[in-house]
From Swiss-Prot:
It is found in: Cytoplasm. It comes from Clostridioides difficile (strain 630) (Peptoclostridium difficile). Monomer. Keywords: Cytoplasm, Hydrolase, RNA-binding, tRNA-binding. Belongs to the PTH family. The gene is pth. GO terms for cellular component: cytoplasm. The record marks D91 as: Stabilizes the basic form of H active site to accept a proton. One of its GO terms (biological process) is rescue of stalled ribosome. Transmembrane segments: none annotated. The record marks N9 as: Discriminates between blocked and unblocked aminoacyl-tRNA. This is Peptidyl-tRNA hydrolase. It catalyses: an N-acyl-L-alpha-aminoacyl-tRNA + H2O = an N-acyl-L-amino acid + a tRNA + H(+). Its main location: cytoplasm. Its EC number is 3.1.1.29.
Length: 186
């Protein structure tokens, strides 16, 4: 079983913001896999389905970003899934808009959602797909920046990155993470 967690904040006012790219990737996967992500369980919107022979759980935590670990620890304990089969997708200010990066494990850096997850799981030994949202301009508040929407001139690049992130996660599930990293970490 694979658990794919997209990080974001619940509520209309956060839709399509930089901080919610994880939710956007889950929406793409849900459509692609014909999985309805509408059931409320484990402080999250979840949907279960199959990708090939693999059972897949798509997850959009509803706890707000900084408490995302509460959702994931509940799911981890309930489903008894291997850490290597938990894939977290989230925004990264250290990557330019349009870029993605896949890692088998590692720190969450300055990302508060990832800090919450690694703290609650007691490990950072799980795959993650980072979607570039770029850095704020000099003097711009980081919180305001990540809660902002993409500029019109960024829309093609971010849409391409979201599709690429969904394809990379599909590759992780259908093939393996090493193949996905070779294919998408360019």
């Amino acid at each position: 079983m694979y658990v794919v967690v997209g990080l974001g904040n619940p509520g209309k006012k956060y839709e399509k913001t930089r901080h919610n790219v994880g939710f956007d990737v889950i929406d793409i996967l849900a459509k692609e896999y014909n999985i309805s992500v509408t059931k409320i369980k484990h402080k999250a919107l979840i949907g279960e389905g199959r990708v090939g022979t693999e059972k897949v759980l798509l997850v959009k935590p509803q706890t707000y970003m900084n408490l995302s670990g509460e959702t994931l620890i509940d799911i981890y304990k309930y489903y008894k899934v291997d850490l290597s089969n938990i894939v977290v997708v989230y925004d990264d200010i250290d990557l330019e808009v349009g870029k993605i990066r896949i890692r088998k494990k590692g720190s969450g850096g300055t990302h508060n959602g990832m800090k919450s997850i690694t703290k609650c799981l007691g490990s950072n030994d799980f795959p993650r797909v980072r979607v570039g949202v770029s850095k704020p301009e000099a003097g711009q508040d980081l919180a305001d920046f990540v809660l902002s929407r993409f500029r019109k001139e960024e829309s093609d690049n971010i849409n391409e990155a979201l599709e690429k992130a969904a394809d990379a996660i599909d590759s992780i599930i259908r093939e393996n993470i090493d193949m996905s990293m070779n294919k998408y970490n360019g």
